[in-house]
Regions:
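N-terminal secretory signal peptides
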Residues: 24-86
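Residue-level marker of positions within ordered structural domains that often coincide
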Residues: 1, 13, 76
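N-terminal membrane-targeting segments
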Residues: 18-24
């Protein structure tokens, strides 16, 4: 067998051993994010592209420090907390984060998230390229439920 044939045979063997090529794993699903105020009958629906990050931005009610929670929708119709950002070590510890740094990756899936609209500065939702106040759905103290509806 010539050196060129051996090289080709070795390359063919390596390709066969590697198996079929796989696509990158999905980093999120497309779908619709729904935020509802069940008591008032108001809701907000936001269409999201696959893997599109949406965020809830607020002042932590205990520590009065800024927090950003980043989420995506998964293929199972759940909301997945992907990251928490805060300059406050106390806020990060509240989330169970003990390492240094303001931003921390997470992987916490939830079927729904319940919020109370803050009595001070209301939370804001950044989704679909728009930022909206939770006050668009109710008053301070109202209960909001966030869910995913896969497409």
């Amino acid at each position: 067998m010539s050196p060129r044939s051996r090289t080709f045979a070795l390359l063919a063997l390596l390709v066969a051993m590697a198996g079929p090529a796989r696509a990158e794993p999905s980093r999120g699903a497309s779908g619709e994010l729904v935020v509802e105020n069940p008591e008032r009958g108001t809701s907000l629906r936001v269409r999201l592209r696959p893997g599109e990050v949406f965020s809830v931005v607020y002042q932590h009610s205990i520590y009065e420090q800024p927090v950003i929670e980043d989420f995506v929708l998964d293929e199972g119709g759940r909301i997945v907390l992907r990251a928490v950002t805060s300059p406050s070590a106390a806020v990060r510890e509240y989330f169970g984060i003990t390492s240094a740094g303001e931003r921390h990756a997470m992987a916490r899936p939830m079927s729904e998230i319940v919020f109370r609209i803050a009595t001070g500065t209301a939370q804001r939702l950044r989704a679909g390229g728009v930022e909206r106040s939770f006050l668009e759905l109710g008053e301070h103290g109202d209960r909001l439920v966030m869910r995913a509806h896969p497409s």
